[in-house]
Amino acid sequence: MDHDDFDSVSWRHGPDSDISRPTTSGTDTAESPETRRDPNGKRRMSSASEIPQAGPHADALDLAGIGDGVLECRVDTPIKENDGTKDAYISYLVTTHTDFKSFQKADFTVRRRFTDFVFLYKTLYREYPACAVPPLPDKHKMEYVRGDRFGAEFTTRRAWSLHRFLKRLTLHPVLRRAPLLAIFLESPDWNAHMRLRGSRASTSGSDGGGTGIFDNFTDTFVNAFTKVHKPDRRFIEVREKADKLDEDLTHVEKIVARVARREADLETDYNDLATQFRKLVPLEPEVEVPLQVFAASVEETARGIKNLKDHTDQNYLGSLRDMEAYILSVKSLLKTREQKQLDFEALVDYRNKAVAERDSLAANPSSYYASNPLTSSPASFIRSKMEDMRGVDHEQSRRERMRKLELRIDELTREVESAKTTSEMFDEEVVREVADFERIKAIEFRDSLGALAEQHIEFYQGVLNTWERFVAEMEEEQSTGDAHPNA
């Protein structure tokens, strides 16, 4: 994928704009979405007129609601479709609640498969290169190899990851306004839209995609061996914090994975304990009731441990891995920003070399056609000899070269100004993206840790209730036995 094509970047408003908030705002009133332009003069992406399913009260400026709008999504209930055929797949229920007028209803549901999410991600990644688009969960190739991709554990884990993906989109101040996201959440004709949009993308890519891919690969390859002359301390700190967070999450992930394995071992041990106590019933029939009640209590505790283990493994552990992937998206955006700065600095170097050569020709004309190889540069000596062989007037050749250098300097000056503007605007975009990432990360950590705490509270409350009930039953059994000693 390519982050270097900024002809279609949808630049956001300045730092004082309300659009930097998670809620949408009606600050785009200066011109309609159809006529808005980016810094390069290209038409900005997306317009409300492209949304065929927009509600009857939708406004052209209201792509995702104006003001403090609500957009909440939930992904759950995986179901196997076309079971028993070679085209079987898993679909997920996407439930949306919103007060945006661009939608036809406030509450609606659709079913989407994983490839639909992939299409949504790739399109957003391509159309919003200045955003750190949240990544999708990995394909989990081992599940595909083992044939477990239809298993409940795998599909539940993926449903949680897809839920986090959509929630990150709805919390992003720009991506939540993407027309494609609205279509994805509501449209009953999603497959037709996906085919139509895919054909358009392939057509536009075939028009000039080969050269663009080669140019971008060349730029990336060259920049890989180049260092920024004036690194920005802001982004160095962001990169260092991202690396540290990634490292810490890796350690936490390993610990949580070990905790999940131990919870699975505890579940097995408790189930084995209940089984062994039930085997004592035929051997000790006089204490059958206490043995059965104790075994049932142990089994209930094992079920509680299983629920806790499932949440730890499928939800919380997955949230850590998804956050690691999200951090990689931010790092990729930082790398793209650095490449833009490298492009600007390279253009400045080219212009400075051209200016130095022009000034040298103007200050010392004889250096252009020096005939002594000991006192002139090899290039000047070879050029002078070649012109002598062709009978070229050295002075006229020098003036022609100065004229070309002037034109080249003017062109490079314009390119430098354009690259500087693009680099500075992209810097501001990255600053906003980092702030959005920090906000989304804080919300996600709060929710995931809160859900984990609630699961532990529910588990321990269940354990307390189970064994208090067991003690009460045993006391009742004992009091009954004391009241009827001869029974």
Swiss-Prot record:
<dbReference type="GO" id="GO:0034727">
    <property type="term" value="P:piecemeal microautophagy of the nucleus"/>
</dbReference>
<keyword id="KW-0813">Transport</keyword>
<dbReference type="GO" id="GO:0010008">
    <property type="term" value="C:endosome membrane"/>
</dbReference>
<feature type="binding site">
    <location>
        <position position="158"/>
    </location>
    <ligand>
        <name>a 1,2-diacyl-sn-glycero-3-phospho-(1D-myo-inositol-3-phosphate)</name>
    </ligand>
</feature>
<feature type="binding site">
    <location>
        <position position="113"/>
    </location>
    <ligand>
        <name>a 1,2-diacyl-sn-glycero-3-phospho-(1D-myo-inositol-3-phosphate)</name>
    </ligand>
</feature>
<keyword id="KW-0175">Coiled coil</keyword>
<keyword id="KW-0963">Cytoplasm</keyword>
<feature type="binding site">
    <location>
        <position position="115"/>
    </location>
    <ligand>
        <name>a 1,2-diacyl-sn-glycero-3-phospho-(1D-myo-inositol-3-phosphate)</name>
    </ligand>
</feature>
<keyword id="KW-0072">Autophagy</keyword>
<feature type="compositionally biased region" description="Polar residues">
    <location>
        <begin position="20"/>
        <end position="32"/>
    </location>
</feature>
<keyword id="KW-0472">Membrane</keyword>
<comment type="function">
    <text>Sorting nexin, involved in the separation or division of vacuoles throughout the entire life cycle of the cells. Involved in retrieval of late-Golgi SNAREs from post-Golgi endosomes to the trans-Golgi network, for cytoplasm to vacuole transport (Cvt), and autophagy of large cargos including mitophagy, pexophagy and glycophagy.</text>
</comment>
<dbReference type="GO" id="GO:0061709">
    <property type="term" value="P:reticulophagy"/>
</dbReference>
<dbReference type="InterPro" id="IPR036871">
    <property type="entry name" value="PX_dom_sf"/>
</dbReference>
<dbReference type="GO" id="GO:0000423">
    <property type="term" value="P:mitophagy"/>
</dbReference>
<dbReference type="Pfam" id="PF00787">
    <property type="entry name" value="PX"/>
</dbReference>
<feature type="region of interest" description="Disordered">
    <location>
        <begin position="1"/>
        <end position="59"/>
    </location>
</feature>
<dbReference type="GO" id="GO:0035091">
    <property type="term" value="F:phosphatidylinositol binding"/>
</dbReference>
<feature type="binding site">
    <location>
        <position position="139"/>
    </location>
    <ligand>
        <name>a 1,2-diacyl-sn-glycero-3-phospho-(1D-myo-inositol-3-phosphate)</name>
    </ligand>
</feature>
<dbReference type="InterPro" id="IPR001683">
    <property type="entry name" value="PX_dom"/>
</dbReference>
<dbReference type="Pfam" id="PF09325">
    <property type="entry name" value="Vps5"/>
</dbReference>
<dbReference type="GO" id="GO:0000407">
    <property type="term" value="C:phagophore assembly site"/>
</dbReference>
<keyword id="KW-0446">Lipid-binding</keyword>
<dbReference type="GO" id="GO:0034045">
    <property type="term" value="C:phagophore assembly site membrane"/>
</dbReference>
<dbReference type="InterPro" id="IPR015404">
    <property type="entry name" value="Vps5_C"/>
</dbReference>
<comment type="similarity">
    <text>Belongs to the sorting nexin family.</text>
</comment>
<keyword id="KW-0967">Endosome</keyword>
<dbReference type="GO" id="GO:0032456">
    <property type="term" value="P:endocytic recycling"/>
</dbReference>
<dbReference type="GO" id="GO:0005769">
    <property type="term" value="C:early endosome"/>
</dbReference>
<dbReference type="GO" id="GO:0005829">
    <property type="term" value="C:cytosol"/>
</dbReference>
<dbReference type="GO" id="GO:0015031">
    <property type="term" value="P:protein transport"/>
</dbReference>
<protein>
    <recommendedName>
        <fullName>Sorting nexin-4</fullName>
    </recommendedName>
</protein>
<feature type="coiled-coil region">
    <location>
        <begin position="395"/>
        <end position="430"/>
    </location>
</feature>
<dbReference type="InterPro" id="IPR027267">
    <property type="entry name" value="AH/BAR_dom_sf"/>
</dbReference>
<keyword id="KW-0653">Protein transport</keyword>
<feature type="domain" description="PX">
    <location>
        <begin position="70"/>
        <end position="192"/>
    </location>
</feature>
